[in-house]
Amino acid sequence: MKTHSNDGNNTNGENGNNSYDVIIIGGGPAGATAGIYTARANLKTLIIDKGLTAGALGITSKIANYPGISGEIGGAELLQIMRDQAQSFGVKFISERVIGVDLLSETKSVFTNTDSFSARAVIIATGSMGRVNRIPGEERLLGRG
């Protein structure tokens, strides 16, 4: 991820539409959980994520051992439950790719392909996707245990 300097040409503007207390990069379990805690602390929170199936949980087809969930559930379905809970506390989610950040200033900036956002704090919760496929046919088994 490249770092940008804040040259004043972003869309944060004076109206504060893109200004938050906390921006969380990554909307998986860690990002959603962080969002729940920050929103419950009355902090205006934005989660920027590439999409519901961008992370390891989102592509997992079956989970049978998650606390509080009886039976089996798909990873994307479990992730949606987490996101719904975060949204119920006021977290805003957007689907974007983060292309850069400026974390050196007191007000932090996060840049996406189409916009920029500012916050007092940035949490990076990008998770993991592991290694790339190395065995022919591996992609058809990905997320199946």
For each feature predicted by the language model, list its residue ranges.
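FAD-binding core/adjacent interface of flavoenzyme oxidoreductases
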Residues: 1-25, 41, 93-145
